[in-house]
Amino acid sequence: AVDAKLLDMLKANGQISASQYTELQAELAKDQKEKQIAQ
């Protein structure tokens, strides 16, 4: 799974674009919401 720290690292390294970063962050937030609901 992707986490926020990994996302920041990839963005800092220039391995993902700003738009990819935003997209992945949104996905991450959605995943976290679903996990909270599941608990």
Swiss-Prot record:
Broad class of the protein's primary localization: membrane
UniProt entry keywords in alphabetical sequence: Cell outer membrane, Membrane
Keyword Membrane: yes
Protein's recorded name: Phosphate starvation-inducible protein 1
Any one cellular-component term (Gene Ontology): cell outer membrane
Location in or out of the cell: Cell outer membrane
